[in-house]
Structures are given as C-alpha cells and as structure tokens.
C-alpha cells in the first residue's frame, strides 16, 4: 500500500527578520487523523513556523501544500478559507459576548429574506441551538450556552476557543500552547477535549513547552532547533529526556547518558 499523503506539508521554509534567521529551510508534515506536536527551545522557530502555516506571516522562500496542492496564504483569512483554524495563546475570544456568539464570531447566522437574501438581523436561536449541539458532541460542560464568556473559568474559555476551531476547521486545527496558565483540573479538561477533537476526525498541530502533555497527546513530535527541523520522534521511540537532549543540541555522549538514565531498573 502507498504511504498516505500529508494533509499539510511544508518544504524548505525560510524567514528572515533582518539579519536574524527565524526559519532556515524548515520542513513539516501533518497526516490524516493525527496530532503532531512542535517542540523546541526559545528562538527555535516554532512560532514562526506556525505563523507561516496559519497565514499570519509569509515565508521568504519554500512552499506549503494543502492536500497536495501548493498554496500561498497571504493572511489568516486565507488559511481559514482553506479550512485551517488556529487557537492562539491569547485565545482571541470576545469576553462580553455569550458562548454561542463566540462560536459564530465572524460567521454569524442571519435570517434569510423572502428572496433568499441575507438580512442584517442575527438568528440567535439557530446559533445557540447549533452551539449547544456542538458542545454536547465535544462533551464540554457549561451551565448555559447563553453565558457571557467573561463569566467562565480559564479552562472553559479555552474550551470555547477549541470548540470554535473544531466547528469551522475543515482540514486541520492549530493550537498554540493550549494549556498555558491553566490549573491542573482545567488542563486535564483541555487535554481530553483535544483528544476528542482528533477522534472526531480533525488532525491537530500543537505547540507546547509541557513535555508530559506533548508525550501524552502527540502521535509524532517535531523537534526544532535554530530554525530547522532536526528530528521527528514518537512517544514510543524516544523518552522525554532524549527529546530534550535533541532539542538542546546535546552531543552523542550526552544523548546516550539521557537514554541510560531512563532505562528500566536504573
């Protein structure tokens, strides 16, 4: 059988900020029904890579392919139109609006006129009905879909952002530090939610500094250093210590030492 084709693929991405090289020929692949984590030290190029994949910036060189077709995202709107949704670390939710309005933010449902023309009046009943069904499908617990987001906990707000991405993403979702600044219980809820999103058939890219979360969620782990992909590992093939050693540019001897430290019985 032939290898599955990547849903999203990048080859040789380069990005300069003056004399600073943020991406230096970076490669990336995301396959159907998988979670890929991107890890790396500060300045490794993780955020720049994600911004290029989500249309937040344009690479100076290289190419991006979506379902095998070369694409050029000139804005996040281009990526969204192509079916890529991104959950940013700062969430980008509207605190004063209710949950349903946040799910439909920028995509509000409106009543149709007698000739099929869209009217300005929002169809709040439809938005609340669809949002409630979506939350039930993802097993997200809230008191009411009419709650203003500002009344929610940090974990629940993150759940709203993830649910919005899952509703509108046709191809994949990108999540930047999805559990940052959350408590233990809220973190558990978000991790479980990301798993359910993937189980629903949506592949996911995550950036995280939390290695236990990365090793719990990810099918594959892309390790970046100095703007390049230096390795792709799995939780089965490498330990956390080994992944960190690769990430920091450890020597072969140091990597062997990391492997020895985590051998069973040691």
Feature locations, PLM:
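Glycine-rich phosphate-binding loops of nucleotide-dependent enzymes
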Residues: 2-266
């Amino acid at each position: 059988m032939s290898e599955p084709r990547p849903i999203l693929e990048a080859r040789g991405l380069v990005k300069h900020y003056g004399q600073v090289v943020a991406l230096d020929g970076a490669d990336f692949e995301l396959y159907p029904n998988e979670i890929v984590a991107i890890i790396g030290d500060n300045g490794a190029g993780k955020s720049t890579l994600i911004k290029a994949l989500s249309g937040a910036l344009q690479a100076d060189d290289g190419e991006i392919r979506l379902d095998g077709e070369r694409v050029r995202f000139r804005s996040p709107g281009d990526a969204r139109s192509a079916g890529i949704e991104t959950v940013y670390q700062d969430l980008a939710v509207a605190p004063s609006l209710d949950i349903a309005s946040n799910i439909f933010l920028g995509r509000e449902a409106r009543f149709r006129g007698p000739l099929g023309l869209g009217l300005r009046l929002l169809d709040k009943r439809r938005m609340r009905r669809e949002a409630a069904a979506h939350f039930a499908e993802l097993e997200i617990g809230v008191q009411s879909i009419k709650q203003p987001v500002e009344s929610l906990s940090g974990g629940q707000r993150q759940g709203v952002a993830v649910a919005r991405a899952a509703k509108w993403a046709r191809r994949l979702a990108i999540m930047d530090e999805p559990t940052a600044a959350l408590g233990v219980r809220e973190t558990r809820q978000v991790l479980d939610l990301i798993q359910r999103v993937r189980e629903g058939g949506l592949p996911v890219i995550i950036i995280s500094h939390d290695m236990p979360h990365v090793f719990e969620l990810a099918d594959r782990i892309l390790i970046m250093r100095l703007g390049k992909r230096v390795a792709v590992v799995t939780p089965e093939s490498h330990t956390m210590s080994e992944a960190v050693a690769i990430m920091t540019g450890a020597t072969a001897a140091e990597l062997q030492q990391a492997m020895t430290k985590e051998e069973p019985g040691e």
